[in-house]
Every structure is written in structure tokens, then in C-alpha cells.
């Protein structure tokens, strides 16, 4: 893999990390998304972050959270209100990528969400995130999953 491609992957990974933190903050505080984004950009070194992708994830996941929740609810084993805040933010981000970014292979979406859960979530959050998003990918990416088998 070229260094340019590696840098692009790393920039998207960093965008996801900042986005999940912003989504979590919004869930807890309901601060306006533009304030969350402005503060995050002001307080962090973001020169190696895909800023366009960060902006998209943060704004679109928050704007579409009800639609994303409607996708998640059928594949959850508990009420959505019972989810840990970090898990919910990560699941919403993963659901958004599965639904709206078909150019990203579903396994990459799952792997990235698992890494977010390992970094920010509880001890076994990554296992739960993997299970939920795998079930959701069976609905949203069924043809892709069949080809991968």
C-alpha cells in the first residue's frame, strides 16, 4: 500500500475518532453541532484528519440520528435508551457508513467501529458493536456479504 493511501486511511480513521466523540457529546449535551465542531477544531491538532469526512460524519449522523436509530432498533437486543452513550454513538456512525458509504466495504466499516469501541468503550463493547453492525450489514449489504462468502 502506498504512503499516500496509508495517509488517506489514517486521516479517515482520525475523522471517525473525532466524529464519535462529537456525536457522544451531542447525545449527552445537545449542544449545537456547529459549536461542537468549532471547539473540536480549535482545541485539537487536526492537520492529519480528513476534515471533510469529519464534518460529514458529525453533521449527518446527528441530523439523521432518528433514521439511523430506526435501522438499529430491529437488530438490538435491548432498548436503545439502555445503550451506553459511546456504544450508541459508535453504532450510529457505523450504521451511517453502512447505509450511505457503499464504497467502503462492510468489513472495513465493522473493523473501524470495533476499533472505536476498543478505544473509547467498555471492556466488551467491541464485541457488542461487532454483533449489532454485522446483523445490520445483513440487511443493508446483503449482496456484498453473499459475495464475500
Swiss-Prot record:
Keywords: RNA-binding, Transcription, Transcription antitermination, Transcription regulation. It comes from the Bacteria. GO terms for cellular component: cytosol. Coiled coil: none annotated. Transmembrane segments: none annotated. GO terms for biological process: DNA-templated transcription termination; transcription antitermination. SUPFAM superfamilies: NusB-like. One of its GO terms (molecular function) is RNA binding. InterPro entries: NusB-like_sf, NusB_fam, NusB_RsmB_TIM44. Belongs to the NusB family. Involved in transcription antitermination. Required for transcription of ribosomal RNA (rRNA) genes. Binds specifically to the boxA antiterminator sequence of the ribosomal RNA (rrn) operons. This is Transcription antitermination protein NusB. It comes from Acinetobacter baumannii (strain ATCC 17978 / DSM 105126 / CIP 53.77 / LMG 1025 / NCDC KC755 / 5377).
